[in-house]
UniProtKB/Swiss-Prot annotation:
CDD domains assigned to the protein according to its UniProt record, in alphabetical order: SpoU-like_NHR (cd18108)
Species assigned in the record: Streptomyces azureus
Name used for this protein in its record: 23S rRNA (adenosine(1067)-2'-O)-methyltransferase
GO molecular function, one term: 23S rRNA (adenosine(1067)-2'-O)-methyltransferase activity
Organism ancestry: Bacteria, Bacillati, Actinomycetota, Actinomycetes, Kitasatosporales
Record keywords, A-Z: Antibiotic resistance, Methyltransferase, S-adenosyl-L-methionine, Transferase
């Protein structure tokens, strides 16, 4: 295995770079910290540009990650575990992490150039749910996600990277206002289908529609906003036992996209 250099001096510029990138109050985010083997590998595979990848000297550096970094010419160094403990004081301490340049924000044009359905999240704020939705949307052939009123200001949000296991860089995730999202959907000629408890049609009927759709999911508490409701072509419900009030939004999305799987996989071929 390749012998890796170890950073043992807290004054090393790389240490200061990590300190800077983990500050919560940064306003202009150009670099981000990505943690753990799986998110690192998924981010690298998605084309994210890394400045350097690090590992704690208290654990063996994963060979598969080292090989991938080598193929992509990404520098790799170890950091003394005492410095790692200081860097992530009070936080969960990752064994592997890297500093990457934040990709440019996704635009509606990035979604328009693809052919799968579009996922719209209206007022969904729990980052764990959004991360799960990113992974499911990618797996089931959606062309992108539009986040409205999510309280997320950048896809470089470390919580979102963790929750999505790094897949947030693998498909377009557009941060948008409601009016802009509705205009894009209309201009693209898509029907807006709103998922809600008392929908007009069953989710099973989604699979029969050959057209590209925009699937709207509101927050679990408030549901979709009035503006999106007015713009919807139809509302869709998921049949369930009467004693169950609602499903988690990421579960609802998985059910809806699975009904669309044949259409979306064909569109992505």
């Amino acid at each position: 295995m390749t012998e890796l250099d170890t950073i043992a001096n807290p004054s090393d510029p790389a240490v200061q770079r990590i300190i800077d990138v983990t500050k919560p109050s940064r306003s202009n985010i150009k670099t981000t910290l990505i943690e753990d083997v799986e998110p690192l590998m998924h981010s690298i595979a998605a084309g994210v540009e890394f400045i350097e990848v690090y590992g704690s000297d208290s654990s063996p550096f994963p060979s598969e990650l080292l090989d991938l970094c080598g193929r992509q010419n990404i520098p790799v160094r170890l950091i003394d575990s005492s410095i790692v403990n200081q860097l992530f004081k009070g936080e969960r301490k990752a064994k592997t992490f890297g500093i990457a340049r934040v990709p440019r924000p996704a635009r509606f044009g990035d979604i328009a150039s693809r052919r799968g359905d579009v996922v719209v999240l209206d007022g969904v704020k729990i980052v764990g749910n959004i991360g799960a939705i990113v992974r499911t949307s990618l797996a089931l052939g959606a062309s992108g996600i539009i986040l409205v009123d999510s309280d997320i200001t950048s896809i470089a949000d470390r919580r979102l990277q963790r929750a999505s296991r790094g897949y947030v860089f693998s498909l377009p995730v557009v941060l948008s206002g409601r009016e802009e999202a509705i205009a894009f959907i209309r201009d693209s000629g898509m029907q807006l289908m709103t998922l809600k408890a008392d929908g007009d049609i069953s989710v099973k009927e989604l699979g029969d529609n050959p057209d590209r759709l925009a699937l709207l999911f509101g927050s679990e508490k408030g549901g979709p906003s009035d503006l999106f409701e007015e713009a919807s072509s139809a509302s869709v419900s998921i049949p369930m036992m009467s004693q169950t009030e609602s499903l988690n939004v990421s579960v609802s999305l998985g059910i809806a996209l699975h009904e669309r799987i044949d259409r979306n996989l064909a569109a992505n071929r």
